[in-house]
Swiss-Prot record:
One of its GO terms (cellular component) is RNA polymerase II transcription regulator complex. Residues 543-562 are annotated as: Basic motif. Residues 120-214 are annotated as: Disordered. It holds the Pfam family bZIP_Maf. GO terms for biological process: negative regulation of transcription by RNA polymerase II. The keyword Protein biosynthesis does not apply. It comes from Mus musculus. High level expression in brain, thymus, testis and placenta. Medium level expression in uterus, stomach and lung. Low level expression in kidney. No expression in heart, liver, spleen and ovary. This is Nuclear factor erythroid 2-related factor 3. The gene is Nfe2l3.
Length: 660
């Protein structure tokens, strides 16, 4: 089992001081107090079931609180938290919450249980503080201790010896209640269908319960011994309910002078009481370490021991000032994680005080009302520090969001040509200006930008002093805002986008649109003019609009026909060029084929003349003779002289016939 750390180790006292400062209670922490004595550390170590041999006092004899390396950073965090100022929390709301925090049926039992637990815890704490060498001036320097001594002076002191019996009764009741809580949590897990995990958790719970019972018995023996030996702190014992009532009855700034030196006896006793009596409570299912103020104010009894991890991660991303920046408690550093005392204290108080609360009470208690209900004037009155140039406008109306968005639209690349775009829109026959490239933002991006601005405006009152890099709005941003306002006004005004004919028709209250006047057939147009009682000016304007519209349509049709003819002519030219190329290719192929035929014919002539012989058996000379083909298919060998003379005689005859 893991060795439980004392509540003051690891900066637990400093974290408690920071938590009280966030609530509004100012506590002066002296970081140069002497460290706890070794005797007190030796008395606290037997509370652990298994004490390792290496366990020792975390504070050396020569070094004090100032020697701890983690305290300077947390000291700076405490000063930053105090610099935020005291938040305004209505006291009437807190008092009503405390009055109605316990149901009527279980009020006596719950208050009695808390009273006995606090009384026994205070008694134990006083004895441990005296045994450990605590500061004796803590009992007299605190105004709370003085008031408690005055109240306890009138009460009998015979109740002190019964502190051990009350502690044993408290341990029994806490065991029964923790067993009931564990049983209910096991039933919920069985309903969810995780049977394997439920069995493993049940086994671990039984082992922890056995170990917790053994440690509780040892704690009871220690508390009985301390009650018998040390009784001087019993006069200052008081219950948690009395403490809460006392804190609520004090003025707003009356508790700022209380130092931490007055608190250690009571807090140490409460720590020991909780460690001794609530060991069997399953701390793995308790409130996780990443606790913020929003979750603490909106804590319901149903989800005290269980929290949805998705909801926890979503809430951790909200711009609240959280105590722990890590969303996963396993990955949190030991320096920033809250000690086990803080978890057990919240577990005990939430289990006893918030278990029987009606859920309707928590519906009216919402931390968001502190941000949404304030006006800028009230916020400026509550916080005395300047706002460092940032706007405290926390309203949710669209005007503020639009104005805040206009300040930043110059940084995303908007062009001032949108203003000229509105004025350059022509009438029916007008032309549109040259298109420009404008920056376009998606609607989802703009919506997300609005949401982020809205969150910063609402929740920045506690964190605006940390934003040192945020510069004040310059004159350039205001110039961009003016340009964007003109552009948005130009786009939002419907009269600017109308044509000249539409504006004239609207001015004369003509009951027809320009499109109907232009596109309507002639018969319908004439019947329309006869049905309505129109003035001469309206009729002339309607006819002018129709004439200009028809001329515009005719011109558009003419341009369309010209474009069609040009496009068709271009297509025809392309087709003719393709056909010409095809014919050229075909001619080339034909000339190649003719050349091949001539070569073959010449080879055939050579072959024939090589085979021919005259009457004397000599070969025929192809240069003197030629082959002549007749119509019947016969082939004759004729001298070339006769063929050439016959061609010459036929040529003059042909010329004569042409002349005749």
């Amino acid at each position: 089992m893991k060795l439980p750390k004392p509540w003051w180790a690891g900066g637990g006292l400093l974290q408690l001081t920071i938590l009280l400062s966030l609530v509004g209670l100012r506590v002066d922490l002296d970081l140069f107090l002497p460290p706890p004595a070794a005797a007190l550390w030796e008395e606290l170590l037997p509370l652990c079931p298994t004490r390792p041999a290496s366990a020792s006092n975390p504070f050396s004899a020569s070094e004090g609180w100032e020697r701890t390396p983690l305290l300077p950073a947390k000291g700076r965090l405490l000063h930053e938290v105090r610099a935020l100022g005291v938040p305004f929390i209505p006291r009437t709301r807190v008092d009503a919450w405390l009055v109605h925090s316990v149901a009527t049926g279980n009020a006596d039992g719950a208050h009695g249980l808390l009273g006995t637990a606090a009384s026994s815890a205070v008694g134990d704490g006083g004895q441990s503080a005296s045994a450990g060498g605590g500061d004796p001036r803590a009992a007299h320097s605190s105004p709370l201790a003085a008031e408690e001594e005055e109240e306890k002076a009138a009460e009998p002191t015979a109740q002190v010896p019964d502190a051990g019996g009350c502690g044993s009764q408290e341990n029994g009741m806490l065991r029964e209640k923790s067993e009931a809580v564990d049983h209910s949590s096991q039933q919920e897990e069985n309903e969810e269908g995780v049977s394997a995990q439920a069995k493993s958790r049940q086994q671990s719970k039984t082992e922890e319960h056995k170990m917790a019972c053994a440690s509780a018995r040892e704690a009871e023996k220690i508390t009985e011994a301390r009650n018998e030996s040390h009784l001087h702190w019993s006069d200052t014992s008081f219950s948690l309910e009395d403490l809460f009532q006392l804190l609520s009855s004090q003025p707003e700034h009356s508790l700022e002078g209380i130092s931490v030196e007055d608190i250690p006896p009571f807090l140490s006793s409460v720590c020991e009481s909780v460690n001794s009596s609530a060991q069997n409570i399953n701390l793995s299912q308790a409130i996780s370490h990443d606790v913020n103020l929003h979750e603490a104010m909106l804590l319901y009894p149903n989800n005290t021991f269980r929290r949805d991890p998705s909801a926890r991660s979503s809430q951790a991303q909200e711009p609240f000032l959280q105590l722990n920046p890590h969303t996963n408690p396993e990955q949190a550093t030991p320096a920033m994680s809250l000690p086990p005392f803080d978890n057990q204290m919240r577990n005990l108080t939430s289990q006893d005080l918030l278990y029987d609360l009606d859920s309707n009470i928590f519906d009216g208690i919402n931390l968001m009302s502190l941000a949404t209900g304030f006006s800028p004037l009230e916020v400026s009155q509550l916080f005395e520090e300047p706002d460092s140039g940032l706007s405290l406008n926390s309203s949710y109306n669209s005007t503020s969001l639009t104005n805040s968005y206009r300040i930043y639209d110059g940084t995303v690349g908007y062009n001032s040509d949108l203003q000229s775009l509105c004025h350059d829109l022509g009438a029916v026959g007008g032309c549109y200006p040259e298109p420009h490239k404008h920056c376009h933002m998606d609607h989802r991006t703009i919506a997300g930008f609005h949401v982020s601005l809205e969150c910063q405006q609402v929740f920045h009152d506690h964190t605006y002093h940390l934003q040192s890099g945020a510069s004040e709005p310059t004159s350039e941003s205001f110039a961009w805002s003016e340009k964007s306002q003109k552009t948005s006004g130009c786009l939002d005004n419907p009269d600017r986008n109308l044509s000249r004919d539409e504006q004239r028709a609207k001015a004369l209250h003509i009951p027809f649109s320009v499109d109907e006047i232009v596109r309507m057939p002639v018969d319908s147009f004439n019947s329309m003019l006869s049905r309505y009682y129109l003035t001469d000016l309206q009729v002339s304007l309607i006819r002018d609009i129709r004439r200009r519209g028809k001329n515009k349509v005719a011109a558009q049709n003419c341009r369309k026909r010209k474009l069609d003819i040009i496009l068709n002519l271009e297509d025809d030219i392309c087709n003719l060029q393709a056909k010409k190329e095809a014919l050229k290719n075909e001619q080339t192929q034909c000339s190649k084929a003719i050349d091949i035929m001539r070569q073959k014919l010449h080879g055939l002539h050579q072959d024939v003349f090589n085979r021919l012989r005259d009457d004397q058996g000599r070969p025929v000379n192809p240069s003197q003779y030629a082959l002549q083909y007749s119509h019947d298919g016969t082939v004759l060998i004729v001298p070339k002289e006769l063929i050439s003379s016959g061609h010459k005689k036929e040529a003059p005859k042909g010329k004569r016939e042409r002349r005749n």
